[in-house]
Amino acid sequence: MENPAFKRAIRSFVLRQGHLSAGQQRAMDEGMPKWGIEYRPETMDLEQVFGRAAPKILEIGFGMGGATAEIAAANPDNDYLGIEVHGPGVGNLCKLIAEKELTNLRLMRHDAVEVLDNMLADGSLDGVHIFFPDPWHKKRHNKRRLIQAPLVEKLAKKLKPGGYFHAATDWEDYAIQILEVLNGNADLENTADGYAPRPDYRPLTKFEARGIKLGHGVWDVIFRRK
């Protein structure tokens, strides 16, 4: 009999019902035909998708998309592919792309593990961002955490030599786990001695700034592909 816990572990998300506002639904209806990429189990040519040769950065789980849009706007020489399954976030980021007139950002609403397995070529990415993934803070739910060895192994294969993997979390025990998992991958090396300072390209969110004022920590982990 197949282990149901393993079936859960290979997905990159747990689907939660989120209510789309009318504006988010409209933005998604108008935006996804322009900026969305449909899931197909075949390798895509990222240069063809974006219409140019430029560094390609993948973000898994962009939430409401505010930081993603800000990063794309501040780094027009890079191309960004964001993956998120929850409708309100996808709709909100479509709205931000339109408002900021971004041309270097594309979206997918699909399970990131399937996209990695079937659509992204090995050595095709210059960077991967996973910012503030669900911490699943109850111990019995820790197995649902996204950043675990099987996913990191997949991501390492998709990175070019010298490409980077950047994770950030505000849960210390998850930060410890992330560091352990990444240290355990022979293809990756830490860019810092333990945790890294927040790079300029990752914007400080309002939530994060408020937490820092209250004395809460945020941990950035940045590794490079050997």
Curated annotation (Swiss-Prot):
The active site is at 134. GO terms for molecular function: tRNA (guanine(46)-N7)-methyltransferase activity. It catalyses: guanosine(46) in tRNA + S-adenosyl-L-methionine = N(7)-methylguanosine(46) in tRNA + S-adenosyl-L-homocysteine. One of its GO terms (cellular component) is tRNA methyltransferase complex. CDD domains: AdoMet_MTases. It comes from the Bacteria. Its EC number is 2.1.1.33. It is an enzyme of class 2 (transferase). InterPro entries: SAM-dependent_MTases_sf (IPR029063), tRNA_(Gua-N-7)_MeTrfase_Trmb (IPR003358), tRNA_methyltr_TrmB_bact (IPR055361). Transmembrane segments: none annotated. Pathway: tRNA modification; N(7)-methylguanine-tRNA biosynthesis. Gene3D superfamilies: Vaccinia Virus protein VP39. Substrate binds at residues 138, 170, 205-208. S-adenosyl-L-methionine binds at residues 59, 84, 111, 134. Keywords: Methyltransferase, S-adenosyl-L-methionine, Transferase, tRNA processing. Residues 140-145 are annotated as: Interaction with RNA. HAMAP family: tRNA_methyltr_TrmB (MF_01057). Catalyzes the formation of N(7)-methylguanine at position 46 (m7G46) in tRNA. Belongs to the class I-like SAM-binding methyltransferase superfamily. TrmB family. NCBIfam families: tRNA (guanosine(46)-N7)-methyltransferase TrmB. This is tRNA (guanine-N(7)-)-methyltransferase. It comes from Chromobacterium violaceum (strain ATCC 12472 / DSM 30191 / JCM 1249 / CCUG 213 / NBRC 12614 / NCIMB 9131 / NCTC 9757 / MK). The lineage of its organism: Bacteria, Pseudomonadati, Pseudomonadota, Betaproteobacteria, Neisseriales. The gene is trmB.
